[in-house]
Amino acid sequence: MMELEKELKQKMEEITPIDRQVMEAAWKNWDGLCKPLRGLGWLEEALVQIAGIMRDDRPHPDKRAVVIMGADNGVVKEGVTQTDQSVTMQVLENMGNDLSTACVMSHQAGCDMIPVNIGGLTDGVHPKIRNRVVRYGTGNIAKEPAMTREECVKAILTGIEIVKELKEEGYQLIVTGEMGIGNTTTSAACAAVLFGKDPADVTGRGAGLSSEGLNRKINAIRSAIAVNKPDPKDAIDVIAKVGGLDIAGMVGCYLGAAICQMPILIDGFISAVSAYLACMLNQTAKEYMIPTHCSAEPAAKMIMENWEWKHRFMQACIWEKEQVRLWVCL
């Protein structure tokens, strides 16, 4: 086992289950209110879960961060997207300048936007962008691995460190997010491997692909799996071979949240795939995750059903984390 994997294993040993006794106390608090018992349904359950996560029966996660993992994906060369890779860094810069939809809704939900450049083609310019580049873009998975195993582990560790930094800065709740042209392709590739499905069964239109573009996307994923032969039982192998740096970074965020005992919200398809991969590395990390909705992408429903998560706030296909911001407002 390489040194970085040993380091990752040691960090994951810090993850412990959430506090059930605190959750019982939180339920008593809720049941003592003048309202129908369990009247808020899944939202009430999630708030009690947050109590157990934070070890506080009356939690107030007032300082919140939306962490956007930005990275470019070489599979764009296969014509699987509507835009080129330059858009990834453009959007990260816009986030730094508070000019994106995500920024507007984050502010409305009382969240600070934290754009992280973990694998863009260039360094971020705006001072709000946290440049933690593991490598400048990934390989074209249709022809080669996305990255080396070592780079994958380094990206996961980077995600963990970002969350630890935010904890030290006083943040109490994390929302996951990503920005990476081509990442619905890499996420669908991971899902196809993990669930043993034909790519056609797990691949959607992403940001509005035409039928021709969708076929290119499916074929690119089939090629990626055939060329790289990822091991479905090895999360790191799957990410390194057919995933992306944004996915690896988000995996680290989920693990980091569990290590730091912080609630972390899952938003959208790519976030859900990353959450699933994180739980392959440490199953207890799931206790710190809160699903906010079920994406319209085909594989998202598979993940939610596999985990028996029924808290589907909405079935949507809105981009830049709008759904999770609505959840935080509630």
Enumerate the language-model features and the residues they cover.
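N-terminal loops that bind phosphate or other acidic moieties
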Residues: 2-330
